[in-house]
Each structure stands twice: as structure tokens, then as C-alpha cells.
Amino acid sequence: MKYIIVIWTLLSSVSVFAQTVVLRWESNSGTGQITVVNGELEKIKSKGGKIQKDRFDLSSAANKELWLTVGKARNEIGPKATVVNVLMDNEKSFSFFLRDVSSEYPIYIPDYGVTVLPEGDNRSYTQVEHDVLSRKRLTKIEKIEEEPEMSFQSAALSVRKMNVPIWLGLGRDIRIFEVEDELETNSLECKALRPRYSGTPVTLPESNNQGVFYRYAIGRGVGVRNNVKRSLEEGVLPIYHSEMRDDDIKYHSITFASLSGAELSEENVVGTDYFISDKYSPGRVFTNEQKVILEKKLANQLMDMQEVVLCSKTCAENVGNVPRYAWLKTPQPGDGNWKYVFDVNTGFSAFSKDRVFCVSKVNDKPIPNEEMAVLLQPGEKVDFEFYLFHTPVTWEKAEMLADVSFDSKYRECKSYWKSKLDRAAQIEVPENRINNMIKSGLLHLDLITFGQQPNGPLAANVGIYSPIGTESAPIMQFYMSMGWEDEAKRALTYFLETQQENGLIANYSGYMVETGAVLWSIGEYYRYTKDKKWLMEIMPKIKKSCNYLIDWRNNNKKEELKGRGYGMIDGKVADPEDNFHQFMLNGYAYMGLSRIGEVLKSLNIIEADFYRKEADNWKKDIRSSLIVSMSLSPVVPLGDGTWCPTAPPWAEGNGPRALYQDLGTFWSHGTFTIADGLLGPLYLIYCEILEPSEAIAKMLYHYHSELFYQGNSGFSQPYYSTHNWYQAKMGLTKPFLNTYYTTMAATADRETYSFWEHLYKMTPHKTHEEANFLMDTRRMLYMENKDTLEIFKVIPRNWLEDGKKISLHNVRSYFGELEVSAVSSISSGVIEANVECHSDKMPICVKIRLPHPENKVPTKVEGGCYDEKRETVIIKPFDGKSVVRLTF
């Protein structure tokens, strides 16, 4: 008897018995087919419909319902669960996990007008709809819409707080310093200084060819208080300020990078050859031919370049009313066991006579000991300075620098970085943090854009990594937006110079997505600049890459791939080794080819029509595979009780990878959601395969927001998700601001504004993340929509409180240079805005959103037609200059 019980238990655990469910449609469902995965379709039944094997026709049936009986069903948790595919001839196909069918939470798909219920549940579609909607549940996005607009202050209270090591350098030159204080968020016992060549730590014979680092200290030590405050010069320049309060002694430090033997100026910064910077930037994969070029460049690199030095000055001040001691420690190499000498007469620290690594002074004289205690009277100060060389120098070079004034180097550095900002467009918004992040962000990007001056390719690095076609794109496009067209062009040239002979652009770690992404950025550059001369110069390389993509696509035009990747290229798009027909990969390839077709048409080049036609056909094939993939992908529940169709990240998939329909282990980079949420089908909207307003685009957005976001922000590396681009395009202000502030507050250092790559603090100074934040800011302020310029579409409402002003001076767009301003005089009942655009590519229409801070509707509108729902003034036709005035 006990064996019978065991057998019965085993059989029950794998659900081998038949299960019947009923599908009920709202209206005419038409014809279709039923297939079952991991189970067997035993029977289809209908009242008045026509059934033939696995096909059905409910066109003439009075009741639009279908009973399905599935045998050998697998309804236990885990992979290989039974999935029912309802394949409609009207493209409203869907699939569902059989185990998800229940009466309490019925599968109700309003987009397709259908519900799925267990046998015995006799509710009609209308009754199910009423039962679900009467519960008045909300999706995550609907909840956001009911809440106040998100602000940085609100977001900062609920998300991770990040402290990021700061990078200091010159820009163009790969010699940089990483500086880190002993904070509560790290495990340092004192301050750390790490010289780097781009993303690679400097190694020395004295460090046993391991990454060299130095430690120094001020104050009595690490205590119970979190007493370090950090900032940038004027809130924006890459000059690091650190203030520590140790009871009555206040230590204020200023640290920056400079040249040791020359004035810091753009003329004196030689820069580093992009091939050499790539050698020191992890991820770069050189072809055999490129390795030969690299070896030649390394052999010929200049050995007499100016030394790069880290300049630091700490002023210790007694702010108490009795005498107090201040403590100082000069930079020491390694963990205390490295061999070196300190010269008490000069304040030099050296590995040997001709290997000086640091010059230290106190009150402008050589420091007499490596560690000091100085008694300060109330109000008295002591200055502790040091110059740390990027790599050790001769005694003579150290002596030369010892006589240099710190203050003169400080003035040079400020002037150097300010001159760069002066060449850029100016943006001012009524939120100081955002103002600072725009300016500091541009300089952070510039700091690790490497290359020789004054001309030639620039490597737009992304943190420690070499340039990547996708990740460098927002960097180059923000350069374009801020008027740094030359930097953008030189950064694009990098990818063309590293193009392989067959046209493939694939520099980073086997990423196959770069070719399309680079072509897209070239197309964007042309939209901004109409630089016909340069485009004609690089046209052979452009065509070579386009033809490479087309040949690659043609190799995938196989009958067995119809609907599952036909005409779609295959390969990985990021670190995971997912070499499939990925939607992201093909989206970028299509967008790149489409942009080049547009460029060629403008230049009257004969291949224009061919490339446009190829791009259009590629788009059709991608859409066909997407529709098939979605039909086979299980629906998922949303927060409002409805269910939504989903899509896999690649054409051969059967659903979101995170649902684990199949056996496998895919967790990576701190999350289960990479393939779906960060690299998945939402890119088809971003890459213009789908229009944002399409129903299918909205479905993708809806289930992504429920499954793959926390606080409306992605996991691990949230700036890889394109949903905030979608929210901006759709004018979803509250969701946009929720993502904008939540992601920024959780990813960026709140004092120095540098970004981590990942939320688990992997790789600092990640400029791909920072550039995406900057481009989000740009889109918040202005963006193009075909022949229309949209201004302030998703700005915070409180930016137009009384007395506040928004100003965009000389920003760049597809329509040329823009001058935009808005001034709120709510106390006088007025908001006024000005828009100017004087170019031969002006927009036909301008839409400017001016939301009243208290949601009021204007009583009078001057300067255009008013769209009350969108709080937007529409100016059409636009003649180059408009003044809009709202009276409340």
C-alpha cells in the first residue's frame, strides 16, 4: 500500500493529469491555432465554432469561448513548465503558463480582449473585466502618477548613498590619479592615492610590478565620527576639495593634477596616442595587424614628455579657543613594508637617488619629518603641501618642482578647466546640483577622452574601459549638444581608424554591436553639423561598414529562421556570452544603416536608396520576428490585475530569460535581469524599429516597469535601460523624473558627482553612466521629434516657481544653435519664455511646455496655441524667434 501512495505522490508532483481551461473573448476572436510546450493538447472544444485538430474558427460562434484540455501538464515551480500558445491569425497571439491560470487572479489581457479561466469558472469576459477593475489596483507607473513629482531630496532618502573615488588628470593624457578619503563607505585607514595609466594601475619595480599606491594622513586618525566633507572647485572643476573637522582642528585640502615643468595650458598638454591609451584601457581587443601598429607606437612614444604631478595642499586651522595639535603624515608607498628613504633636508621621499616620488613641505619649507604634530594657537594655521609624481623622477626634476608655488599651479589649473567650459554651451536651471552636474559632467567626460593634441583621433573612454560604440555614443552626442563638435568628430574618427579591413567595428571584448552604433552616431553628427566635407572624406569607410552589416544580414536569410531571426544578425551586445539574434544588436544595426541612408541622400550619393531600402527591409524582418516571439512568450501579471504580453531578448527565445522557462544559470553582474531589462527588446523603441506610441511599444514598457525596475530604475547598471528615453518621448513627466532622480541619486557621488558603473560599486568614474544622465538632462530640456522642437517636455514643475529661470545658451540640436529661456513671475501671474533658432534647418513647429507650479491653467496665452492637457504652447509655423507669455 505504501508503494501505491509513493507512486501517487510522484505522479501528482509532476502534474501528469489532464487540465482544462477556458478562453473567453470580448468580441470576435477569429481563427487560430493552439500548440502546447511541455505538455500535450488533448482536446479543443467550442460551442458553435469550428474545430479541426489544433485549429479553431470562432467567427460564426455565438459565444466566443474555447475549452482546452492539456495532458501531461507540468505545473510545478521551476523550468520546463507547460506553456499554451494561442496563435491567432489576426496577430493578437499570446501564450501563458498553464500553472498561472486561476480564478482569484484570472489571466485578463485587455490589449487583446481575452481572458483565461480554469474549468468551472463561468464568468464572461465582461464579468472578469469588472471584477479585476473594481479592485482599483494600480500598476507601478500609475502609482507614480498619483504621487508628488520626484525630487533629488526625496530620492536621496530612499536609495543607496554612493561615495566614488575621484579621478584627477589633464584630459587627453592617460596619466591620472585616483584619490580616495577614509570614508564610512570604504575600508581605508587613511587617504589613498593611486596613479593610473587610464584604466590600469601604474606598476613600478619597487612595487614588485604590482599596482603602486600611496597613503597619507591628516588629523588624529579614523574615529567614530563621519567627519569628511568633499566637493569640487566651484562645484564643477576637477579640483578636489576635502574638509575634515577633528574637534577644534579643521583640515581643508585642495588637490589637483598638473604639469610639473610647464604651465598647465591646452597648448602644453601633448596628450597620449589613442593606440597607447587603448593598451592601458581594459577590454580592448587588438587584431594582429593592430598589434604590430601598437608595438611601433610604443617604441616611438616620447620619453621626454612633461611629468604629470598631483598637487595637494592642506591648511590645518585651530578654530577652537585653546591651543590644539594638528597631525600630518606625508605620502608613503604601499602598505608600510615597501623600501624607500625620506630626506629630512629636502622633504623628498624616494626609492633611490634618482627615483623621487614625492616632495613635501610645511609652511613652504621642506617638511622635517614624515610625521608631524604641530601645536596651533587659536586661529593659527599651518600649511602642508606635497607634490606626488605620477612616476618617480630624478633628484634634479624634484628640486625644480620644490621651488614652484602651489598657488601658481592652483591658478593655472582653474584657468585651464574654466577655458574648456567657456568653449561649451551654457545651461542654467533653478537646481544648483543639476547645474553643477552638467558642467562637471562635461569635464569628467573630457578628463578621460584621450588622444594627441591638437588633432587626430580621440578615445572617448568609458571609465576604466576603452571606447565602446554603444557606451561612447552618449559621450559623443553630449559633446555635440554642448557645441564640442570637433571633439565629437575626433572621437568618431577613433572608431573609423580602428575599423577592420572587412568593415567590422568591434574593439571591445567581442561586442558585436559597435558597427551599427558607430554608424548611428555618425548620422547623429551629420544631423547636428551638416559637415559634408568630413562625411565625404570618410565615405569609403562608412560604405565598408554598411556593406559588412548587409552581408552579415544576408548570411542569416535562412528559411529555418523565418519568424525566429530571419535576416537578423547574431552576436553578443555586452559581457554575457549570448550570441543570439538579439533585438538590441539588430536595432542598432538597423538604426546605423538607416541614418547612413539619410546622410547619403542628403549628399546625393547613389547608394542612398539601396541602403534605405535595405534598412527598411531589415526593420520589417525584425518586426516579424518580434511578433512571433511575443506570441510564444508567456503573459505576466501587472500591478492593476491585468496581464501583459512579453518578449524575449532575442528572436530565438521563448520568453523573458528571467522567467527561467528552460534550465540554465544566467545570474550575472548582480542581477537576474540583465538580458531582459538592460539589453532586451525595449531597445527596439530606442532604435526606431517601433514608434513610441505603438501599442506593442506600450506593452514592452508596461511589463518592463513591473518586472525589471525598482523605484522605476533598472538593476545593477541602470543606465543601460532605455525606458527613461521612452518616458521622455511620451511626455510621462512623473515617471521620467522618478527614474531621473532615483537613478542619479543611487549611482552618483552626491558631493563630487562621479558615477559608479554598477550599483554594487564596480569601476569608478564611469562616463557612460554620466553621459546618459547628461543626455537625459538634455532631453528633459529640449529634444527633437521629426520637424518639431520640444522644449521643457518633462521638466520638474517646481522649476517654474516664482522667481526661477531656465536658460539654454548656444546649445546645439538637429535644428542648429538654440537660445531658450523661461522666467517665472508667478507672484505677478506670468510665465514668459523665449525661443530663438537662426539656421537654415529651423524646426517647422516648436512646442514649449510651461507647467504652473500649482497646476493652474492660464487665463490668457500669447505667442501660440495652448494644449491644456500637456500644458504646452504650440508655435506653428515657427519663424526663428518666438515669445510666449502665459497669464494666470
Give the role of each language-model region.
Residues M1-T20:
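Bacterial Sec-dependent N-terminal signal peptides
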Residues Q19-V429, T788-F888:
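Terminal accessory carbohydrate-recognition/targeting modules of carbohydrate-active enzymes
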Residues K143, M244-D247, E380, V393-E396, ...:
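Low-complexity, Ser/Thr/Pro/Gly-enriched N-terminal "stalk/linker" regions
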Residues G261, M303-M305, V309, P368-F406, ...:
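The feature captures the catalytic groove of carbohydrate-active enzymes
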Residues D422-H444, G469-T470, Q500, V513, ...:
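Active-site acid/base region of carbohydrate-active enzymes
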Residues G451-P454, E497-Y508, G565-Q582, Y660, ...:
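Acidic/His metal-coordination segments adjacent to aromatic residues that form catalytic metal sites
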Residues S466-W484, K489-N502, T515, P540-K543, ...:
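Active-site core of glycosidic bond-cleaving carbohydrate-active enzymes
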